[in-house]
């Protein structure tokens, strides 16, 4: 997944609709993104085009252990539920966002139903210096936590992302693959290289 930074912001049409946290929406609006809309956890927004629609539901996420999480901006995961007609069964894609493994994730399949695939933000992001220091604050799932999330959410297919963009990542993609393999789940991993596409 891309990170919101000055480069990404410069390249975006200011009229593009953005669904985000209630914390981020007013900040984006002040930067000229008038269509930014903040939603609370478990709220959703639906966008339709003809008979097709996608419903985006805000899901629980936490960027750091309590009480440190209060010092960081809130994060959210997203359930994307795609339908092509009133009769078609919805297809659900879970996007974790930059969260740790938290108990609230267990509510997701209960509230949202069976999930078809997931995109997990991994990397074991550790501030301030990744693996360069023997200590730090971990703010995203590492390979082991990602594997646990796959099991708890019942994800039949999973695409790991967000693991090698910056020097603060402490858990490469191979950590996740090794952890999934150790639990007999290697066949669920979809390795997606930059610039490539995959059909799920």
Name the predicted role of every residue range.
Residues 7, 31, 170-174:
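Generic recognition of short, well-ordered alpha-helical segments
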Residues 8, 15, 32-35:
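Metabolite-binding pocket within alpha/beta catalytic cores that recognizes anionic/polar moieties
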Residues 12-18, 91-93:
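Short active-site oxyanion
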Residues 17, 23-26, 100-194:
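Cap/insert and terminal regions of metallo-dependent hydrolase folds
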Residues 28-40:
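Helix-loop-beta element that forms the nucleotide-linked donor phosphate-binding surface
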